[in-house]
Amino acid sequence: PIQMASQTWDDHDRSDRYLARDFGQNYLMSLQETGNPIIFTNGDNDTFPLWYNQETEGFRTDARTCNLSYLQTDWYIDQMKRPAYDSPSLPITWDRMEYVEGTNEYIPVQPDYKKSIDALYAEAEKQALNGNPEALVNVKKEFGENPYELQNILKYWVRSKNDDLKVIPTDSIVMKVDKEAVRRSGMMIPGDSIPDYMHISLKGKRALYKSELMMLEMLAEANWERPIYMAVSVGTENHLGMGNHFVQEGLTYRFTPFDTEKTGVKLDSEKMYDNLMNKFKFGGIDKEGIYIDENAMRM
């Protein structure tokens, strides 16, 4: 035991090192100060330090930490639909029976439906031109103005009472952009224009799971009025094909309607500089003699 203690003491010496707490604060400090932001996390190391800071130190209680691993469960969605401290409930409109365990665990992505839907709308438009406008009105009443728009897919397909319609009928979803909401949001606007639509690619995905459906629900319902972020530590497999719409502002990626592959702007340099130089804490690792283990180095 003496040999073990003498040879490995430094490996276990955490004195004056507050990296876990400070990095939790850094994630939260990366969020916009207004608007009750939401941050999606996924693992232990990017969730529990945030919860500690909010629950114990009362730090950024206006923000909501949402763990994607738990978002697959009904009890956690229940929690997210309730206010917590200074954070209002998350923008989820589903009734409990729509997400209770065993319901809507996943929804198949079936882009082969698109051909039939396009034909249905084309025929209805043809009938409308030939003096039967009710045909087009009825089709739009059943599937919406644009059947591939995010809110219509959630309303008329995913949440349909008809089990035959519980599919996502395209692998390319569009979301109409409220430009005034984007201008008010506080996000960086590259260039001088805001796109009319945001495009979400589901190519290669066979289904969307409940947690992913909840992400889309929140994105649609927040409508850029409430900032939504993804922790940088969340793997790309959980980005739901929206990585090209992320702009980094610190230890977080912000969801934006801009395609960064087209704008070339993937980083808000002003916010990043302010966070790194003026806000972030580094848990004492800048002090001489502090032991930095492999986990700290990775962070």
Question: Where are the regions a protein language model picked out?
Answer:
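ER/secretory pathway lumenal C-terminal domains and tails of membrane proteins involved
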Residues: 1-36, 53-299
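Phosphate- and divalent-cation-binding pockets in alpha/beta enzyme and binding domains
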Residues: 48-52
